[in-house]
């Protein structure tokens, strides 16, 4: 006879709560290459879980479409160039990033703005305009973001964190 069923999502939420001063009500957002999951915990109970069929690759594809850069070049730029809203308008990506690619004059600010626009859109879809979560976003103070292992670029993480912070978390 089965007495209890524990979901992996619930256990992960318990670990997040325990490692963050026993916070009881929060969102956990896990963003992987091709999918995103959101978990809503209220009073230490898993209340809601939803999957989305997009992830960090959508950001790389957007940058690639607009700038015509290859994925490897984009990843190098994200790893080595500081991208934020303080970038001068005329500052270009350095030539040393174009090893297997022809050099193009691409503004760092453009790459930042592409990322920011997509991150804002992602945040709205999964949290702020998600009809399944409208009642829970009003009083929520904690959100925990996990990016996939392959895509741990500090720039992207900071843009995600700043976007959620600006929206009220």
Go through the PLM ranges and name each one.
Residues 1, 122, 127-129:
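Conserved phosphate-binding loops in N-terminal lobes of ATP-dependent enzymes
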Residues 144-169:
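Charge-rich, low-complexity intrinsically disordered segments
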């Amino acid at each position: 006879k089965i007495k209890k069923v524990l979901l992996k999502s619930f256990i992960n939420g318990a670990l997040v709560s325990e490692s963050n001063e026993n916070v009881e009500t929060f969102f956990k957002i896990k963003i992987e290459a091709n999918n995103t999951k959101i978990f809503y915990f209220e009073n230490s109970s898993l209340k809601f879980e939803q999957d989305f069929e997009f992830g960090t690759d959508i950001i790389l594809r957007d940058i690639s479409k607009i700038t015509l850069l290859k994925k490897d070049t984009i990843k190098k730029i994200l790893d080595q160039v500081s991208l934020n809203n303080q970038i001068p308008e005329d500052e270009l990506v350095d030539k040393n990033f174009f090893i297997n690619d022809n050099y193009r004059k691409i503004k760092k600010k453009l790459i930042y703005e592409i990322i920011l626009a997509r991150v804002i859109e992602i945040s709205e879809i999964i949290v702020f305009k998600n009809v399944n979560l409208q009642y829970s976003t009003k009083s929520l103070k904690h959100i925990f973001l996990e990016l996939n292992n392959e895509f741990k670029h500090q720039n992207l993480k900071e843009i995600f964190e700043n976007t959620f912070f600006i929206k009220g978390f």
